[in-house]
Design a protein with these regions (language model features):
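Sec-dependent bacterial lipoprotein signal peptides
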Residues: 1-16
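Extracytoplasmic metal-acquisition and chelation regions
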Residues: 18-306
Length: 306
């Protein structure tokens, strides 16, 4: 048996050999700006130019509202100098994410107009599983004037984080504002007030409020056939509203489009929310204003053919 004094000395020596417990290493920031989805990535890229790298870790095909980032994606956010978010609780994962509040930017924080609320319903699209659209509608980036406010908030916080690039950011913002102002003028003049539309998804209410459209939103999956119940609801709306068109976030099934047109004289138009463009669109270099402009062109053309 080892005497108590010797045992104590042995333990002290053992602890000394192990060294003192070390504190967690501080996260080394990587000098990048991260955005939670494409519209903010596109805006920040337009503002930054070549001055700062902008990245969006959202995988292709994922819904930014309901996607749960992987550990690798979270690590990218944690190392970023700034994380640009849509705000209004749009990105559900942010409520439980461990990110420093000082580096997370709510790009809707300067809005003066009230946000739209939905009662919503639970449904499922693709691999994201069941989810609900109840609560605050976060699709305000589709309104060019609200998108402009988000862009200004991006530029403001980017200039604070990277003051050496403030002049470049101001120039980038000025061009982006001009693009968004031009889109606003085109929407205001090209689509008549009072235009009646059915929407396959509750994504267009800010546009409707801005430009005086009448939009009735459903929750239809463009990749799934219409059920008899859904078709009956569309038939009812078609008879009561006499809508011009039905808007889809992405291309509906050919059978769905043909059935709606032949049975209800209801034409389908793709009006992309630009949340997460395809790899092909990205390869073509499409920007957020580009996608909005393409949406407007498609809607205007379809209305002209009615």
């Amino acid at each position: 048996m080892i005497p108590g004094t010797l045992l104590g000395m042995a333990l002290m020596l053992g602890l000394g050999a192990c060294g003192k417990p070390t504190e967690a290493e501080p996260i080394q920031l990587d000098g990048r700006v991260l955005a939670t989805f494409f519209p903010l990535e596109s805006m920040a890229t337009a503002i930054a130019g070549d001055a700062v790298e902008v990245l969006c870790p959202l995988p292709e095909g994922a819904d930014p509202q309901f996607h749960k980032p992987t550990r690798a994606e979270l690590a990218l956010y944690q190392r970023a100098n700034l994380v640009l978010t849509n705000g209004a609780g749009f990105e559900r994962w942010l409520a439980s994410a461990s990110l420093p509040p000082s580096r997370v930017v709510d790009t809707a924080s300067n809005f003066t107009e009230p946000l739209i609320e939905h009662t919503g319903m639970t449904h499922s699209h693709g691999f994201e599983g069941d989810h609900s659209h109840a609560g605050t509608d976060g699709h305000y980036w589709l309104d060019p004037l609200l998108a402009r406010e988000q862009a200004r908030r991006c530029a403001e916080t980017m200039s604070s984080a990277f003051p050496e690039h403030a002049a470049a950011f101001a120039a980038g913002l000025a061009q982006l504002e001009a693009d968004l102002d031009g889109l606003h003028e085109r929407f205001a003049t090209a689509i008549p007030q009072g235009t009646r539309l059915i929407a396959s998804h509750p994504a267009y209410d800010y546009l409707a409020r801005r430009y005086g459209w009448e939009v009735h939103s459903l929750d239809l999956d463009p990749e799934a056939p219409l059920s008899e119940e859904q078709f009956a609801e569309l038939e009812r709306l078609n008879g009561s509203l006499e809508p011009a068109l039905i808007l889809w976030e992405s291309e509906a099934l050919p059978a769905t489009r043909e059935s709606l047109e032949s049975r209800l004289d209801l034409r389908s138009v793709v009006f992309s929310p630009a949340e997460n463009p395809s790899a092909a669109q990205r390869a073509q270099g499409a920007t957020f204003p580009d996608i909005l402009a393409a949406n407007l062109k498609a809607l205007e053309a379809a209305l002209g053919e009615k």
